[in-house]
């Protein structure tokens, strides 16, 4: 320290000022509770297990490859998020299974958890960008150490597919074998059990079938909609036929015939059942009616929350399809047309899974096929408006449950 008396006086004065400021600093008035023992951050999260679970196969073989660590951490992060998605999905399914969804107060809880799944999948899509900082040559350096491990063997992702409602008969065979053949013992049993449980699709289907307003002896939405649509098509045909002969007139009549055929199929229950049997439709005939009713009356307070749920279910399907596509692109970029480490055809197999076969809520997407002018939608008179608002009290299918759900 300098021998200058002036400097010493200024230094001491400044130090005392800082000490005084620290004594009066409200940001420093807390108590360090961790110093007194008890549960601390690392113990609560069991970080000793998580951060030491990255075992590099290349290092075990005496040839440590730097980027294998990124590969492991990224996939472990995927699995942790899959675990959270399953946690949310199981809770939503339990609300439906227990009947608590009939208490409309629980619909907010359902919507919140389904929306959380949507947000997780958006995060998982972004995660590919981190993995793609590794080049194909970087991956090649340690790929030989991974076989026969394969992403197809992700138990949690297969459970997720099953619990959402991917039909096992719509799956693309894996090397001409049933997908469960690639899992052992307890894992195979868990997958079989998940196939036998009610899926989210089935539970949503049952919920849609109870949509108030579908009753033939009540509002009779379906009967009124059918009448309005074909009356509207008849008026359109008369309007077009009044136009002078032209190529445009013929095109308009041809388009009208196509529209009529589309709506004939919509109101043909036998045709619907046939499309369900071939996998082109997934929802029951009555559930489709409920979904379309929610779609048309989405601005009514009674149907705003259900419409948000249907939108989120489509978001999940969309994001899972994008996830598959991003995975396909990444695999193609990393290994080209080589076989996968698990023995599949790699890129070729993965590309075949990016299709509507794996879309669970495809019927919700197809609702847009049946869009009609707003004035064709059956009008609600004042008493019917009241019915919609009071549905949870008046409709036995939507009556409030006295039970609480988690």
Swiss-Prot record:
Reaction(s) catalysed by this chain, per the record, are: L-tryptophan + O2 = N-formyl-L-kynurenine
Instruction: Tell me which EC number(s) this protein carries.
Output: 1.13.11.11
The record's GO molecular-function terms, alphabetically, read: heme binding; metal ion binding; tryptophan 2,3-dioxygenase activity
Q: Quote the record's cofactor note.
A: Binds 1 heme group per subunit.
Q: Where are the transmembrane segments?
A: none
Cofactor(s) listed: heme
Keywords, sorted A to Z: Dioxygenase, Heme, Iron, Metal-binding, Oxidoreductase, Tryptophan catabolism
Q: Which SUPFAM superfamilies match?
A: Indolic compounds 2,3-dioxygenase-like (SSF140959)
* Sites where the protein binds substrate: 71-75, 143, 341
Question: Where on this chain does heme bind?
Answer: 327
Query: Which function does this protein serve?
Result: Heme-dependent dioxygenase that catalyzes the oxidative cleavage of the L-tryptophan (L-Trp) pyrrole ring and converts L-tryptophan to N-formyl-L-kynurenine. Catalyzes the oxidative cleavage of the indole moiety.
Extract the PANTHER family matched here: TRYPTOPHAN 2,3-DIOXYGENASE, TRYPTOPHAN 2,3-DIOXYGENASE A
Annotated protein name in UniProt: Tryptophan 2,3-dioxygenase A
What is the taxonomic lineage of the source species? Eukaryota, Metazoa, Chordata, Craniata, Vertebrata
Q: Gene name?
A: tdo2a
